[in-house]
């Protein structure tokens, strides 16, 4: 398993200007460097766009893709849409109170997810505002969601039933854009099905990857 800090994320380089196609190019460069000539890809939320783009631009490298809570809505990030939905009510609240309110709308079980997230390193703390904004800007680019309708590789889409960062409706809209995709809703999940229903996610995704792996 290769877990990648994409350009602008984590401990990777953080240029002030990023183009959407840079992500797939970086992934291909890394795979070549470590002698991986084919792989299955899992992309979460906006990362689903990158997995889709990788499959379209480098089909020979991709045996299948798994998209978790994908969305085809452009121009605004999921977290921004969630805040805007309730801004009339919470915009003047203190930050802690805002977060508690939004957590109840992000997660199926907010306490469980916050416990998990405490163990996730916040690499944004080592990024400047300009570097963080560069990543946000690339995912708000017009036209990037067009990539979904060009996907040809086997595709599994997983959506959490609960939470408002992204919705099952948004995920289903992506599924409708990808011919012959499989669509699964996890009934006890929200933003992170791979954590909230880890055993089911691991089993189903492993089976899907093996089913479409090169013989």
Model-derived features: where do they sit?
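Active-site loop/oxyanion-hole signature of alpha/beta-hydrolase fold enzymes
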Residues: 2-42, 203
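Alpha/beta-hydrolase active-site loop signature
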Residues: 6-10, 72, 190-193
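Conserved catalytic-core motifs of eukaryotic protein kinase domains, centered on the activation segment
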Residues: 12-17, 76-79, 168-169
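Gly/Ala-rich beta-loop-alpha elbow adjacent to hydrolase catalytic centers
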Residues: 43-47, 51
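Flexible "cap/lid" loop of the alpha/beta hydrolase fold
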Residues: 52-57, 63-93
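Conserved alpha/beta-hydrolase catalytic His-Asp/Glu region
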Residues: 75-81, 93-150
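Conserved serine/cysteine hydrolase catalytic core
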Residues: 133-176, 185
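Catalytic active-site module of serine/aspartate enzymes centered on a nucleophile-bearing elbow/loop
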Residues: 181-215
């Amino acid at each position: 398993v290769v877990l990648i800090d994409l350009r602008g994320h984590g401990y990777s380089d953080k240029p002030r200007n990023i183009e959407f196609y840079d992500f797939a190019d970086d992934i291909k460069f890394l795979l070549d460097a470590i002698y991986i000539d084919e792989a299955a890809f899992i992309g979460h939320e906006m990362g689903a766009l990158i997995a889709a783009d990788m499959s379209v631009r480098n089909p020979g490298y991709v045996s299948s893709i798994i998209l978790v809570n994908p969305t085809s809505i452009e121009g605004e990030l999921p977290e921004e849409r969630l805040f805007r939905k309730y801004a009339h009510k919470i915009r003047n609240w203190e930050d802690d109170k805002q977060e508690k309110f939004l957590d109840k709308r992000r997660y199926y079980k907010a306490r469980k997810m916050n416990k998990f997230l405490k163990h996730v390193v916040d690499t944004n703390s080592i990024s400047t505002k300009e570097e963080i904004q560069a990543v946000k800007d690339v995912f708000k680019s017009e036209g990037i969601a067009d990539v979904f309708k060009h996907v040809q590789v086997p595709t599994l889409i997983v959506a959490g039933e609960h939470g408002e960062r992204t919705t099952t409706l948004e995920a289903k809209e992506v599924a409708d854009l990808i011919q012959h995709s499989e669509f699964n809703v996890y009934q006890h999940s929200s933003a992170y099905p791979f954590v909230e229903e880890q055993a089911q996610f691991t089993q189903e995704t492993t089976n899907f990857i093996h089913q479409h792996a090169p013989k």
